[in-house]
Amino acid sequence: MIRKAFVMQVNPDSHDEYERRHTPIWPELESVLKDHGAHHYAIYLDKARNLLFATVEIESEERWNAVAHTDVCQRWWKHMRDVMPSNPDNSPVSAELKEVFYLD
């Protein structure tokens, strides 16, 4: 498994709405993530900094990157763009983090 971590932001007035939309995520999005090899996906909210911290374990970079090209992911991004900073293609503005320590 490949461990990934990344950060995103949520609009200051959208914390509750962001959480509501993830409780739960759409079943078809969950299926696509699992079908593309995503495991142990978690998102944490730092309300003081409007920061989202996400971790996920993936089976391959290619399968993970393919999620972005699915219809359900495109619809999800469009659904979320009003609660978080987004790129022109509606994907969330995010930054991948480098792992510097891991204890198994």
Curated annotation (Swiss-Prot):
Highest rank taxon of the organism: Bacteria
Catalytic activity: alpha-L-rhamnose = beta-L-rhamnose
Catalytic residues of the enzyme: H22
UniProt binding sites for substrate: Y18, Y41, W76, W77
Recorded GO MF terms: L-rhamnose mutarotase activity
Keyword terms, alphabetized: Carbohydrate metabolism, Cytoplasm, Isomerase, Rhamnose metabolism
UniProt enzyme class: isomerase
Protein's cellular compartments: Cytoplasm
Gene Ontology biological-process entries: rhamnose catabolic process
Gene3D superfamilies membership: 3.30.70.100
InterPro entries: Dimeric_a/b-barrel, L-rhamnose_mutarotase, Rham/fucose_mutarotase
Listed PANTHER family: L-RHAMNOSE MUTAROTASE
Cited NCBIfam families: YiiL_rotase
Family: Belongs to the rhamnose mutarotase family.
Quaternary structure and interacting proteins, as annotated: Homodimer.
Protein name: L-rhamnose mutarotase
Protein's organism: Enterobacter sp. (strain 638)
